[in-house]
Amino acid sequence: MWINKYACEFSIDENLVAATIMTESGGDVKAVSTKGARGVMQITPATAKRLCKKLQRPFSVAMLLQPQHNIFLGCYYLHNLLNTFDGCAVLALAAYNCGPNRVQSWLEKTPHLTTWEILETHASLETKHFVWSVLYRYGNRTR
């Protein structure tokens, strides 16, 4: 329900959102990572606080465990990342995992490389695995 609603609101493929959720948390609304990311879309409190400030919405760490709020923020964040990286899902997903500033620095260091070469050259094993896992699940959902 929330996936469809917010994917539509932010013009994102709902299958990409669902694949991100399954990769991040397996759909566990109470998931908390070792790095403190929370909820189905595994958003860190720092990222959520920044997004809420930008949206002029109230913020609390507890709201990250509420699917409606978590999916709203996750879709908003993914939408912004897709816009930042010109609709490139690979770079947007990498940024979702390791941060947009890091991905931007990869692009600045090696502008001559393809998207896949940039990912292979610069991304950590965790980020590579995340991107591949989301894309694999996305592919399975869209067949």
Over which residues does each language-model region extend?
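Catalytic glycan-binding domains that act on GlcNAc-containing polysaccharides
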Residues: 1-143
